[in-house]
Amino acid sequence: MQEQYNPQDLEQKIQKHWDDNKTFVVTEDANKEKFYCLSMFPYPSGRLHMGHVRNYTIGDVVSRYQRLQGKNVMQPIGWDAFGLPAENAAVKNKTAPAPWTYENIEYMKNQLKLLGFGYDWNREFATCTPEYYRWEQEFFTKLYNKGLVYKKTSSVNWCPNDQTVLANEQVEDGCCWRCDTPVEQKKIPQWFIKITEYAQELLDDLDNLDGWPEMVKTMQRNWIGRSEGVELSFAVNGETSPLEVYTTRPDTLMGVTYVGIAAGHPLAEKASQNNPELAAFVEECRNTKVAEAELATMEKKGMDTGLRAIHPLNGREVPVFVANFVLMDYGTGAVMAVPAHDQRDFEFATKYGLDIIPVIKPEDGSDLDVSEAAYTEKGVLFDSGEFDGLAFQEAFDAIAAKLEAEGKGKKTVNFRLRDWGVSRQRYWGAPIPMVTTEDGEVHPVPADQLPVILPEDVVMDGVTSPIKADKEWAKTTFNGEPALRETDTFDTFMESSWYYARYCSPQADDILDPEKANYWLPVDQYIGGIEHACMHLLYSRFFHKLLRDAGYVTSDEPFKQLLCQGMVLADAFYYTNDKGGKEWVAPTDVTIERDGKGRIEKAIDDQGREVEHSGMIKMSKSKNNGIDPQEMVDKYGADTVRLFMMFASPADMTLEWQESGVEGANRFLKRVWKLVHEHTNKGTTEALDTSSLTGDQKALRRDVHKTIAKVSDDIGRRQTFNTAIAAIMELMNKLNKAPQESAQDRALLDEALKAVVAMLYPMTPHASFAMWEALGESDLDSATWPTFDENALVEDEKTIVVMINGKLRAKLVVAADATEEHVRELGLKDENAMKFLDGLTIRKVIYVPGKLLNIVAN
């Protein structure tokens, strides 16, 4: 091996070896245990960022570790290639989304290869190709025929600038999260898939996902939002249809003083027809739709419709208000309001001078006071007629029974989860395979006419989707009759909901080859950001159950283990421009002065301007604080970047990018390289004779095997990769100081270095591959992970600490099996101990076996 560690030449050579030998290409093998490791595939935005590098490094470390465990490891990669950024880039660059996307894929593919990730490139695909989305289209038509797909007109958040529908969570302060344009409400027909039919199963099966972070499971439970309650009817004066409401607190029914309805509720629309003031308020509510998460903090507003609802049990009339906090998407779009026992209702009632009637008091008999705030705990009913004195569950059951007997309500289970709206009014997505004939009937496109191909040679004007603008494209036939194609495209979550399964058989002449899919699935380890907890991860679980029920897969869940990696942070700097706005400056263009504690005192950019330090924040284009992985690989090599990524922080925590840390990782790799070079340069070593080792040699070998045990557990079970690397570094410090005089010294070092190189392989595969060969071994890619020798861990001797009156006074080295009596005797005779015991009377001697001798004397 070369004396100097030169990653640039080395890495290229080894990557070529992997390519030439198809090292990571796998097929099904019934005789081998499989391991399917998958990192969430990238959107081809143009360049990899450090978030990508972290995600894919973790995946590669897990894959290579499992490979050395002797498993048949599949690690595929592909491209989540549809989506709005491609359209925006196409408009900006006066091109079509397709060529922009394919160029980016080519560039990013080369970047991934330079980082040395062990992918099976034979399985690569891009979701924007007809070969991929054709099967998605066919599966959608099968779901339609099963009654799991429907079309309905629904009110959507519409961004007039992007000309697209936004999910509730993409609306921030009433504006589009992407371009900050005020969002409008618009009613359009859309396609939905009935995820609600699977709500209970999606909820129940979370209990079986032992390998998932609790936080993600909790987020999904809350998103699905199962509740048990009562659906009841309030008659409305002058209306034929009653007002349906759902409540989880029927025990508070006698405290209802008004009913709130959503601005989109039919009653609100009807009431506003002859009431211009109400009509204006309804319009205001519709156009300031907010994410559900913001409901709690926003100002509560309402307006009396003039309608009166009749209480179903006591007949009292209560006003019906349009309220901005009632969402049409959730429940029935109407709520019964009990100001005495719900804080939101309380604030609203106080603001509009509505009655507040308490009907629940504390179970312990303490005083009830609802003058300042609602009493929201469960308690005992009073002023509730026949239900007085009942506790929550008794009251729940009794009131539900009475409502049911009178035909005014029933117990029901409700889910917060809504059906999945999969229509998007964009061009760059998979066409929805439906047609409408002249008689208005809607039909799925027959399988033999699929795929419905998205034309790629288009001109983007930035306003209208080319397939909506091109009237000819929509014209088709169905059973010989003229028909019009659907011009909406699928939500891009459709493609990412089943891509993991397509990797199992990417060339299959169907959505999946069941035999291959059932060999590989479920995914053993999935890696990606926690921001996908409620959308992508839930949709993928749903899609997997659809594939199961269609007979393609036998498992219930797609991902056994889930690791959510933390974000990558970097220093961010800015100066204030003439207009008072922030201009962000790249950290690489900033010179920093630090104080004695390492804190930034002053920062000057390359134009000589003093800039403000905004702290360590997520790397992003908008803050100009991204670090280009390419530059780091060119400067230090891929192995160094990978090692830093895995060492700088626990995988699930944020990682603070510090180039000094990258330099540290590089120095460490050079030290390992240097020691291997020095060792191998002295020629071959003789076999290690473990029976003739000296005490020091045994101690060093014990450290080697303790490290193997720890690293194996840290990578394989705990996934604390940073502590695994720290343990290897600690061992290297000892190996650097170890004597190399005798043949057995060198034989022991040989065993130790082979273990170090193999343990570093998942993180630094190129350097490890070369050092492994230099150590006289062949093909590290198919080697076996080092195993620790139980006998080496057995200690012949132990160090016992001697404490006198709580202070450390001596250390004893004794045989590992020394008796308490022997240790006491040695401790009391120890020279140091005797010095401190001189003239004192020993009152007590406490022995903690194998660790401590504590002497109390005065």
Curated annotation (Swiss-Prot):
One of its GO terms (cellular component) is cytosol. Its main location: cytoplasm. Keywords: Aminoacyl-tRNA synthetase, ATP-binding, Cytoplasm, Ligase, Nucleotide-binding, Protein biosynthesis. Its EC number is 6.1.1.4. GO terms for molecular function: aminoacyl-tRNA deacylase activity; ATP binding; leucine-tRNA ligase activity. It is an enzyme of class 6 (ligase). A motif ('KMSKS' region) lies at residues 618-622. One of its GO terms (biological process) is leucyl-tRNA aminoacylation. It catalyses: tRNA(Leu) + L-leucine + ATP = L-leucyl-tRNA(Leu) + AMP + diphosphate. ATP binds at residue 621. It is found in: Cytoplasm. PROSITE patterns: AA_TRNA_LIGASE_I. Signal peptide: none annotated. Transmembrane segments: none annotated. It comes from the Bacteria. A motif ('HIGH' region) lies at residues 42-52. HAMAP family: Leu_tRNA_synth_B. Belongs to the class-I aminoacyl-tRNA synthetase family. NCBIfam families: leuS_bact (TIGR00396). PANTHER family: LEUCINE--TRNA LIGASE, MITOCHONDRIAL, LEUCYL-TRNA SYNTHETASE. This is Leucine--tRNA ligase. It comes from Aliivibrio fischeri (strain ATCC 700601 / ES114).
